[in-house]
Amino acid sequence: YHHGAIRLDDYRAAWDMARQTGVRLDFNLPRIIKENHQKVVEDLLTACAKDFPPTAVHVHNIGTLALVRRLTSLPIHADYSLIAYNQRTLQFLRDQGVVEATLSPELNMKQIQPLAKNSPLPLTCIVHGRLELMVSEYCVTGSFLGGNGEGPCSQPCLKGKYALKDRKEAL
C-alpha cells in the first residue's frame, strides 16, 4: 500500500472504539491492490469479518467486489470509482450483492434525480471537496518533487502550487 497497510491491532482498537461509542465503522479496501499484497488483504479481510465485523466493506473495483463476496458475507458498498452512472450499472451492482452505491461524481443534479428516484439500492453522492482525477501507480508531481516512494506521500499537489491546464492554458 502507498500509505501502509492497517495492522489488525489498529483495526481492532478502532472497532472497539466504534462499538463503545455507537459509531458505524466501515472497512475501506485500497483502490489498487498489487499482486504481492493480495494475501495480506485477504488475511486482514477474513480476520476482520470473523472477529471484528465492520458495518460494511467499501470496494473500488470489480476484483475486490468479487473478493469480498468470496471471503465474507459482509454488506458491500460500491465506491464512486465503480462508475455508477446509470440504472443498468446500479442494477448490476445490486445483482452482485452491493447494498449501497456512491454515484459517479461527474453526474449533475438533473442526472442524479431520476437515478435516485428509481434506484434499486440506496445511493450516496460526493457533493464537494477534492476529488482524485485518477489513481496511478506513480504520481507525476510526487516523482519530480520527491516523497512518492513507499510510505506516506508528501502530497505536493495539495499545497496549492500545482494545477492542470488545458491546451489553451486555462484551468
Spans of model-derived segments:
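Active-site pocket-lining/capping segments in soluble small-molecule metabolic enzymes
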Residues: 1-92, 96-171
